[in-house]
Amino acid sequence: MAAVKRIVVLPGDHIGREVVEEAVKVLGAVEQSLSDVHFDFQYHLVGGAAIDATGSALPDEALGAAKEADAVLLGAVGGPKWQGGAVRPEQGLLKLRQELGVYANLRPCNFAADSLLELSPLRPEIARDTDIMVVRELLGGSYFGERHEDEGDGVAWDTDKYTVKEVQRIARMAGFLALQHDPPLPVWSLDKANVLASSRLWRKTVEETFQSEFPNVQLQHQLIDSAAMILVKNPRAFNGVVVTSNMFGDIISDEASVIPGSLGLLPSASLASLPDSKSAFGLYEPCHGSAPDLPAGKANPIGCILSAAMMLKLSLNMVAAGEAVEQAVQEVLDSGVRTGDLLGSSSTSEVGDAIALAVKEALRRQSAAGLS
């Protein structure tokens, strides 16, 4: 009997709907190639689409389904239509993350195919072999701290608050990921400990956690502003795992995202626990936004497709299938089937079609070699 994997699909707004469709198409190709798995896709509204239909950016029905799922696949939320309202699409995404307890946001920065090197804004000799995993704390800091809006007095403030437990668990995620390699990957912790009290607690806690629990992992600390400079000057200096707070992680991962040539390429996973059993609950979404100005058929679906690959590897205990998707993406990019952001002429669906076909062939090769 085939194992049922329940996946809640939240397309969201604008290009979110398009890229999710292609990721589901690729997952469908995986299912068609394997006899022992069935994907149960359950679609729900989130973001602006949910506001229009229900008045809420995250309807109770969608949240309830997400909590019962094995994993959640999300497209993108937001757009100018909803920015002036009392309820904003982004509120739904923040609530979803908080309610699901996904405290660790994993954002890889690497080249999905070597042929993309020429598209990097950095010189090839600088960008080549960049391979960074940014681990962003997702449920603390200024995005969730106490705040005061300007109410006519000309004053507004946010609170960047962290507890030892919050820092410990994200440090453990970074240490765990480092230990998945032999030898262990180095870990860089980014903070602003020369100015911020929260960063001093961060640095102290990360240091103590690694000393007691990950003594064989090389840990280095770097101030966030100098890290931003180094990332452009010599990104390979951070090859390994980079762990940092919510706001700093948001910024540094977006900076890193341009290195491979397009934000549309990069996936992300937000996990509620260590993926030590390859079955951690996770929320998966591309790093890009909803791009409301982009015409239909122009969006790059690869970031969402690679997010689905991460889901297979980290939440659905289907590591070989996830690797097959990654291999298919590489082959399709190398063949020249690309969207306009990568100087190609293929549509969103054409890229998805090509990757789905390549996935079937990659899984056939795995089966022939006895690897699946």
From Swiss-Prot:
<comment type="function">
    <text>Catalyzes the oxidation of 3-carboxy-2-hydroxy-4-methylpentanoate (3-isopropylmalate) to 3-carboxy-4-methyl-2-oxopentanoate. The product decarboxylates to 4-methyl-2 oxopentanoate.</text>
</comment>
<comment type="pathway">
    <text>Amino-acid biosynthesis; L-leucine biosynthesis; L-leucine from 3-methyl-2-oxobutanoate: step 3/4.</text>
</comment>
<keyword id="KW-0464">Manganese</keyword>
<dbReference type="GO" id="GO:0005829">
    <property type="term" value="C:cytosol"/>
</dbReference>
<dbReference type="InterPro" id="IPR024084">
    <property type="entry name" value="IsoPropMal-DH-like_dom"/>
</dbReference>
<dbReference type="GO" id="GO:0003862">
    <property type="term" value="F:3-isopropylmalate dehydrogenase activity"/>
</dbReference>
<feature type="site" description="Important for catalysis">
    <location>
        <position position="192"/>
    </location>
</feature>
<dbReference type="GO" id="GO:0051287">
    <property type="term" value="F:NAD binding"/>
</dbReference>
<dbReference type="GO" id="GO:0009098">
    <property type="term" value="P:L-leucine biosynthetic process"/>
</dbReference>
<keyword id="KW-0963">Cytoplasm</keyword>
<keyword id="KW-0028">Amino-acid biosynthesis</keyword>
<comment type="similarity">
    <text>Belongs to the isocitrate and isopropylmalate dehydrogenases family.</text>
</comment>
<keyword id="KW-0432">Leucine biosynthesis</keyword>
<protein>
    <recommendedName>
        <fullName>3-isopropylmalate dehydrogenase</fullName>
        <ecNumber>1.1.1.85</ecNumber>
    </recommendedName>
</protein>
<comment type="subunit">
    <text>Homodimer.</text>
</comment>
<feature type="binding site">
    <location>
        <position position="254"/>
    </location>
    <ligand>
        <name>Mg(2+)</name>
    </ligand>
</feature>
<keyword id="KW-0520">NAD</keyword>
<feature type="binding site">
    <location>
        <position position="107"/>
    </location>
    <ligand>
        <name>substrate</name>
    </ligand>
</feature>
<keyword id="KW-0460">Magnesium</keyword>
<feature type="site" description="Important for catalysis">
    <location>
        <position position="143"/>
    </location>
</feature>
<dbReference type="GO" id="GO:0000287">
    <property type="term" value="F:magnesium ion binding"/>
</dbReference>
<feature type="binding site">
    <location>
        <begin position="289"/>
        <end position="300"/>
    </location>
    <ligand>
        <name>NAD(+)</name>
    </ligand>
</feature>
<feature type="binding site">
    <location>
        <position position="225"/>
    </location>
    <ligand>
        <name>Mg(2+)</name>
    </ligand>
</feature>
<dbReference type="InterPro" id="IPR019818">
    <property type="entry name" value="IsoCit/isopropylmalate_DH_CS"/>
</dbReference>
<keyword id="KW-0479">Metal-binding</keyword>
<feature type="binding site">
    <location>
        <begin position="79"/>
        <end position="90"/>
    </location>
    <ligand>
        <name>NAD(+)</name>
    </ligand>
</feature>
<dbReference type="InterPro" id="IPR004429">
    <property type="entry name" value="Isopropylmalate_DH"/>
</dbReference>
<keyword id="KW-0560">Oxidoreductase</keyword>
<dbReference type="Pfam" id="PF00180">
    <property type="entry name" value="Iso_dh"/>
</dbReference>
<feature type="binding site">
    <location>
        <position position="250"/>
    </location>
    <ligand>
        <name>Mg(2+)</name>
    </ligand>
</feature>
<keyword id="KW-0100">Branched-chain amino acid biosynthesis</keyword>
<feature type="binding site">
    <location>
        <position position="225"/>
    </location>
    <ligand>
        <name>substrate</name>
    </ligand>
</feature>
<feature type="binding site">
    <location>
        <position position="97"/>
    </location>
    <ligand>
        <name>substrate</name>
    </ligand>
</feature>
<feature type="binding site">
    <location>
        <position position="136"/>
    </location>
    <ligand>
        <name>substrate</name>
    </ligand>
</feature>
